Regions:
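Asp-based, Mg2+/Mn2+-dependent phosphohydrolase catalytic module
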Residues: 1-5, 108, 112, 126-129, ...
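Active-site neighborhood of HAD-like aspartate-dependent phosphohydrolases
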Residues: 1-48
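Short, helix-capping/interhelical loops that line the mouth of catalytic, cofactor-
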Residues: 236-250, 298-341, 398
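Acidic/histidine-rich alpha-helical segments that form the ligand environment
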Residues: 258, 263-267, 303, 321-361, ...
Length: 398
């Protein structure tokens, strides 16, 4: 199993003072588009649209889609109409922000050292920026993606959640292709965007802090400078740095993230591939979508309601695979199936969000697995999602 290091970008790999950088970035973008809208009004729209991304819980809209839906209508234009101007900004104007940042030689050395050990290195940056802006900042950090084989870099074209959302980390692990077992560590400087949500997601964390910093949220976790991080990794048994999805917060986050991952596949998969079976007896993408929809609506939701409403109820194991042929999934509307899956999953997630810690431990008797409880049943749902996302990704890549 490979060990995965997930690095934050701003003020972790790059000295950027992000709170100071973003206002200058917005001012330059507003000035670049001054002929479209007066700069002060443009700044207001940029901030409003960015906050919409930050707060979004939509699994059927990427952050870019959320931003565009908020940003362009008040301007009286469309994303397509301004696309060339926006590209020009990121090609020509955004790079002029580099002097506001500073590379960290110790971060470059650490990344190179980690890669030399065969570890996977990814950039888990807040995906509130277009990919071009993120790649520019990596180059400013002297970690150009052309030269460093990062396994994943989050961006707003792909991701559905900002980093303050626990679901971001479930989405990140899905795109990473994480197998559910490999050890990993999140490294970041922000308590609100790195430490708290990653811990709630069940991911081990190293808090990158300045001298004298302290926080109750970081009690009991490794912390320090980049040099301290390297020393920690040298002496630690990294194989023991395992994710733990057993907490209610981690389970809900993973279940929330799953349809966002599937949504990504619906966007990148051409229509002619939706009904293409990779081999005889294997499911097409369309069939996987229908399966996820029906399992949520007819298995997962009723199980949760039975456990919450009964006294140690019997939960029957169900073989749902034959439904693919019995219900002619291959002939159904895959896009509609996805929309219905999103709706069913939203009901499931909202139900689980509202229950008490005691209710998570309510018992049940599974006809296959024996004595269990609601929290373990939710864990089965997470594993089911992970298996079918992996299957779907492999299916559409053929």
């Amino acid at each position: 199993m490979i060990f995965h290091l997930l690095f934050d970008l701003d003020d972790t790999l790059l000295d950027s003072n992000i709170e100071s950088l973003v206002p200058v970035y917005f001012q330059k973008l507003a000035a670049h588009l001054a002929d479209v809208l007066p700069p002060q009004e443009m700044l207001q729209e940029l901030m409003r649209s960015t906050m919409a991304m930050y707060r979004s819980t939509r699994v059927d809209q990427t952050l870019e889609q959320v931003f565009s839906e908020q940003f362009y209508p008040p301007l009286g234009t469309t994303q397509e109409a301004l696309a060339a101007r926006i590209e020009q900004f990121y090609d020509e104007v955004f790079p002029t922000l580099q002097p506001l940042t500073r590379s960290r030689p110790e971060a470059v050395s650490l990344v190179e050292w980690a890669l030399s050990r065969g570890w996977g290195v990814s950039v888990a940056t807040d995906p509130l920026f277009p990919r071009k802006a993120i790649l520019h900042r990596l180059r400013w950090a002297e970690l150009a993606p052309e030269n460093y084989p990062f396994r994943l870099i989050s961006d707003f074209q792909t991701f559905h959640f900002a980093k303050a959302s626990v679901a971001y980390f479930g989405e990140f692990l899905g795109h990473l292709g994480w197998d559910g077992e490999s050890p990993l560590l999140m490294v970041g400087d922000s308590i609100e965007r790195d430490v708290i949500p990653a811990r709630q997601a069940g991911i081990p964390v190293f808090w990158l802090k300045a001298d004298g910093q302290s926080s109750p949220a970081a009690e009991g976790i490794p912390q320090g400078t980049l040099s301290d991080l390297k020393a920690f990794l040298e002496r630690a048994d990294v194989s023991a740095l395992k994710a733990d999805f057993s907490s209610p917060a981690a389970l809900v986050a993973a279940l929330h993230a799953a349809p966002a991952l599937i949504h990504h596949l619906t966007r990148v998969t051409p229509p002619e591939k939706w009904n293409r079976r990779p081999a005889p007896g294997e499911w097409a993408f369309n069939e996987i979508l229908c399966h996820l929809r029906d399992v949520d609506a007819e298995v997962n939701l009723p199980r949760v309601e039975a456990v919450l409403g009964g006294q140690n109820p019997v939960v029957a194991g169900q073989n749902t695979d034959p439904w693919a042929e019995q219900r002619h999934y291959i002939e159904q509307d895959g896009a509609q199936a996805f929309r219905e899956f999103v709706a069913a999953r939203a009901r499931l997630v909202e139900k689980l969000k509202t229950i008490s810690p005691q209710e998570w431990e309510r018992p049940a008797r599974h006809t296959i697995f024996g004595p269990t409880h609601l929290r373990e049943l939710a864990g089965f749902m997470v594993e089911h999602d992970r298996a079918h996302f992996k299957q779907a990704r492999e299916t559409v890549s053929i």
